[in-house]
Amino acid sequence: VRSAPRSPTPRKRSAMRRRMLLFVLALASCRPASQIVMRDVPALTWDSPAGIAFDPADSLGTSDLHVVVRYNGSFREDTLTLRIATCSPDSLRCEETLLLRIPPARTAAPLRSEYRIPYRRRVRFGRSAGYRMTFTPTRPVRGIESVGLQIEKSR
């Protein structure tokens, strides 16, 4: 003789809800702590704007921004001056100049080095999509392979 299936008791239902809630919270918190957006540039001579577009992973918390430059042994200078233009989703625009002191490449010319410099700290993005940045060297430069932005959660 089989008995009819019983529905879970209120205590079991509550425990199942808690487990499901913990599972959903664990999935939601699995966002990467860092996001990087790069743009390749002509390594022979870079003299034109290089634009990136990004959607910040976290628009509620604060983020630290780092400018990232990948370069090879052809880069013989010790500084690089960039004009950085930023455009937010609501079309607010800001442009500024940033001087980077780049250490010499310690690798053979075909291999690349990467340099990362802090750009902004504790930035709060107002929206979660539609940001654009343009990096332009103030003079033609050789040996730069790509330029971009790293966004990481503030500590």
Residue ranges of model-derived segments:
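C-terminal motif of bacterial Sec signal peptides marking the signal peptidase cleavage site
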Residues: L27-S29
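Post-signal peptide N-terminal segment of mature Sec-exported envelope proteins
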Residues: V37-S59
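Short amphipathic, basic-aromatic surface patches that mediate peripheral association
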Residues: V67-S74
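An anionic, turn-rich surface loop/hairpin at beta-sheet edges
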Residues: T97-F125
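Noncatalytic modules at the cell exterior or secretory-pathway interfaces
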Residues: L60-V67, R122-P140
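Bacterial signal peptide processing site
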Residues: R31-S34
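Edge beta-strands of jelly-roll/beta-sandwich modules across compartments, strongly enriched
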Residues: D78, P140-I151
